[in-house]
């Protein structure tokens, strides 16, 4: 029996032993376990993830010949795999039956299959399918073993082979372009999913740095009635300038009374959220705990190996009726969230009907707790993610939350209408369990039509619009999900690869590095088809077709080779004309004229200052926006530029650069007007 990792192998062995003797053995320093069940001796042996992968000895590109070989033979960082290889090669031959007990996904299917193919006999092989490592689930999977999941194996092998073909050919092509441009070897990497993700990061980074904020004037009044205080804002109108807003403030100081014209209230229902899939968990852990997506995924996988939660790499938001939820809640009632579990059982009377989300996964249900107790004390981070999963699971069985919203329209002595809003949670419902989504209450004093309220404070301020895009790990993950590239289990790893390669940097807010900018520009120049998600998404769909039996692996690999060949032909056609630009992007070719502000290649000059394409676009955007900015904040253009140059305006870095330079140079200042 082949397990994906040593910890999983141990859990499987002890589950199958029914508490009887488990013999722990070791070969080449790698543990494996022997148990007896139903009169048979079962050897549970672990791998350490993928033991085999595609490789070639061919040089240059295009390269389409490869074979599956032990990864440690060609990857210097995978030397630790050799001891697993030797252990498996020693104990697998000669068994009467082979069982793939790796995780039930396309990666696990390939890991187990390649090991059995290398050291055993795939004609005497079976597949165990389980979603948790809890003892009862392992025993059930053992009793219901099926034939090898050939479609999953073929889909997994196709993905590995396809990603290898794209990665090696495009990376070698990029390095050849860099070698010709720079006159030296430059290590660059690209990939079917990695490349469009990098280009999207570059696009977002440019938009953030080119952002010219819009200014608006906000007026907020604080009013009082019968000892109760509330806030109100303009309704159906807004001050067009700072000067107008200040005038309104002065008027309301002299005549501070407002008449209540309309009072409305309504009750809203907040439906419980479904249990997590991996993407939802990663986004919520980032929002609530500040964890990067890959860290959340790693923690969830460790919780799974501890048998505390179900398999996390799932796209499903559904909890099927086949799971014994009452048994899980009974166990949770004696754990760290026992009070909440007991409360839910009391609330539902034991009738457990979970909310179902729209997304499904044929292999696994939504992430849920098993109710098992940890074998060791959990770290603070592990406990926080575990609590998030348990609370979301409990919320899925709870009733709807009810909130009461009130809206009040008031009129001042000049006839201007103001709107006040209140919110009160009437019934917490599922929010008792998943409090992270509880809306903030805004109390409103009792108000009736005709009542008078007195203005006690008027706040006037300039608000600057934020850039419409973000660049961090969580926002890239959301983008990959929205365009359907990558898988639940690979997206966070691909994003992390962009940081490890030195293309992106920063944690909470990310930046594209000079190397990342160069690679993104080269991909857009030489592989424009690979800079968009369409091509990647099309091949993702083909993988699903293999999994569902609509296509064969060979069909998809042949199509990949054909597409790569066409891309490389276009690449070679474009290469000669792009060599110099690539050298400039890599910083290996000295530019004839450098940007005054950043040293990049200048594309134009304004008032004697040479500017690169980034700063030139920033100049153009700022010039178009400046008159309206000055008018809104009731200032001169110079004062508006001073506001832009300060960080508080939320202007992009390149826009601030141009504004600061214009404030120092009258010629550039006049060019902006």
Swiss-Prot record:
The segment annotated Interaction with DNA runs over 189-194
InterPro entries assigned: Topo_IA (IPR000380), Topo_IA_2 (IPR003601), Topo_IA_AS (IPR023406), Topo_IA_cen (IPR013497), Topo_IA_cen_sub1 (IPR013824), Topo_IA_cen_sub2 (IPR013825), Topo_IA_cen_sub3 (IPR013826), Topo_IA_core_domain (IPR023405)
Chain intervals annotated as zinc finger (C4-type): 595-615
For activity, the cofactor(s) needed are: Mg(2+)
**Which residues are noted in the entry as Mg(2+)-binding?**
4, 103
Q: What Enzyme Commission number(s) apply to this enzyme?
A: 5.6.2.1
Which terms are listed as keywords in the entry?
DNA-binding, Isomerase, Magnesium, Metal-binding, Topoisomerase, Zinc, Zinc-finger
The feature of type site (Interaction with DNA) is located at: 55, 159, 163, 313, 501
Query: Topo IA-type catalytic domain: which residues?
Result: 149-568
Broadest EC class assigned to this enzyme: isomerase
Q: Does the keyword Nuclease apply?
A: no
Q: Where is this region: Disordered?
A: 352-374
Q: Give the reactions, separated by semicolons, that this protein catalyses.
A: ATP-independent breakage of single-stranded DNA, followed by passage and rejoining
* Record domain Toprim: where: 1-134
Source domain of life is Archaea
- Please list the GO biological process terms of this entry: DNA recombination; DNA repair; DNA topological change
Where, by residue number, is the active site?
311 (o-(5'-phospho-dna)-tyrosine intermediate)
Subunit details: Monomer.
The record's function comment reads: Releases the supercoiling and torsional tension of DNA, which is introduced during the DNA replication and transcription, by transiently cleaving and rejoining one strand of the DNA duplex. Introduces a single-strand break via transesterification at a target site in duplex DNA. The scissile phosphodiester is attacked by the catalytic tyrosine of the enzyme, resulting in the formation of a DNA-(5'-phosphotyrosyl)-enzyme intermediate and the expulsion of a 3'-OH DNA strand. The free DNA strand then undergoes passage around the unbroken strand, thus removing DNA supercoils.
| Similarity comment | Belongs to the type IA topoisomerase family.
Which PANTHER family does the annotation name? Answer: DNA TOPOISOMERASE 1, PROKARYOTIC DNA TOPOISOMERASE
In Swiss-Prot or TrEMBL terms, this protein is called: DNA topoisomerase 1
Q: Which organism is it from?
A: Aeropyrum pernix (strain ATCC 700893 / DSM 11879 / JCM 9820 / NBRC 100138 / K1)
Query: Gene behind this chain?
Result: topA
């Amino acid at each position: 029996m082949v397990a994906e990792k040593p910890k999983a192998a141990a859990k499987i062995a002890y589950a199958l032993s029914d508490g009887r003797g488990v013999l722990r053995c070791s070969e080449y320093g790698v543990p494996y376990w022997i148990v007896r069940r139903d009169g048979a001796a079962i050897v549970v042996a672990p791998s350490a993830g993928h033991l085999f992968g595609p490789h070639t000895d061919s040089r240059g590109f295009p390269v389409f010949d490869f074979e599956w070989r032990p990864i440690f033979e060609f990857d210097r960082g995978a030397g630790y795999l050799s001891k697993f290889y030797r252990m498996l090669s020693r104990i697998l031959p000669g068994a009467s039956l082979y069982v793939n007990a790796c995780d039930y996904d396309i990666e696990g299917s390939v890991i187990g299959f390649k090991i059995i193919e290398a050291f055993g006999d795939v004609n005497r092989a079976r597949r165990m399918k389980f979603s948790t490592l809890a003892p009862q689930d392992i025993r059930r999977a053992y009793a219901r073993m099926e034939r090898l999941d050939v479609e999953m194996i073929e889909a997994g092998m196709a993905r590995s082979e396809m990603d290898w073909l794209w990665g090696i050919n495009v990376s070698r092509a990029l390095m050849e372009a860099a070698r010709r441009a720079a006159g030296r070897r430059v290590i660059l990497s690209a990939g079917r999913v990695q490349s469009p993700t990098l280009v999207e990061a570059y696009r977002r980074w440019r938009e953030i740095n080119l952002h010219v904020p819009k200014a608006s004037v906000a007026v907020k009044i604080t009013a009082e009635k019968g000892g109760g205080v509330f806030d109100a804002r303009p309704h159906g109108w807004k001050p067009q300038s700072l000067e107008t807003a200040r005038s309104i403030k002065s008027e309301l100081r002299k005549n501070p009374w407002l008449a209540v014209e309309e009072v409305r209230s309504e009750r809203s229902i907040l439906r419980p959220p479904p249990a997590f899939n991996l993407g939802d968990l990663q986004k919520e852990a980032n929002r609530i705990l500040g964890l990067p997506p890959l860290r959340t995924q790693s923690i969830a996988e460790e919780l799974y190996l501890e048998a505390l939660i179900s398999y996390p790499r799932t796209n499903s938001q559904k909890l099927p009726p086949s799971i014994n939820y009452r048994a899980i809640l009974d166990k949770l009632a004696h754990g760290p969230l026992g009070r909440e579990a007991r409360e839910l059982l009391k609330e539902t009377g034991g009738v457990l009907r979970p909310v179902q989300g729209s997304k499904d996964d044929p292999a696994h249900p939504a992430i849920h707790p098993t109710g098992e107790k940890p074998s060791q004390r959990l770290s603070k981070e592990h406990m926080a993610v575990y609590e998030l999963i348990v609370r979301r699971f409990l919320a899925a069985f709870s009733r709807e939350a009810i909130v009461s919203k009130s809206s009040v329209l008031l009129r001042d002595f000049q006839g201007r209408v103001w709107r006040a809003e209140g919110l009160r949670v009437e019934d917490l419902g599922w929010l008792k369990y998943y409090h992270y989504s509880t809306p903030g209450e805004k109390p409103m004093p009792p108000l009736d039509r005709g009542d008078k309220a007195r203005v006690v404070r008027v706040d006037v301020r300039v608000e600057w619009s934020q850039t419409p895009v973000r660049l961090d790990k969580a926002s890239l993950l959301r983008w990959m999900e929205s365009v359907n590239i990558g898988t639940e289990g690979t997206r966070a790893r691909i994003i992390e690869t962009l940081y490890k390669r030195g293309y992106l940097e920063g944690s909470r807010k990310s930046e594209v590095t000079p190397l990342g900018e160069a690679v993104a520009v080269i991909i857009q120049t030489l592989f424009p088809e690979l800079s968009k998600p369409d091509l990647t998404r099309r091949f993702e769909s083909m993988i699903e077709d293999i999994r569902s039996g609509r296509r064969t692996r060979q069909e998809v690999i042949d199509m990949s080779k054909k597409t790569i060949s066409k891309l490389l032909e276009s690449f070679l056609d474009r290469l000669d004309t792009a060599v110099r630009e690539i050298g400039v992007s890599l910083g290996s070719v000295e530019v004839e004229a450098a940007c005054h502000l950043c040293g990049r290649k200048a594309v134009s000059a304004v008032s004697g200052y040479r500017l690169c394409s980034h700063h030139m676009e920033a100049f153009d955007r700022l010039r178009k926006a400046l008159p309206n900015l000055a008018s809104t904040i009731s200032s001169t253009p110079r004062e508006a530029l001073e506001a832009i140059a300060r960080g508080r305006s939320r202007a992009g870095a390149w826009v601030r650069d141009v504004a600061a330079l214009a404030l120092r140079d009258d010629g550039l200042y006049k060019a902006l007007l």
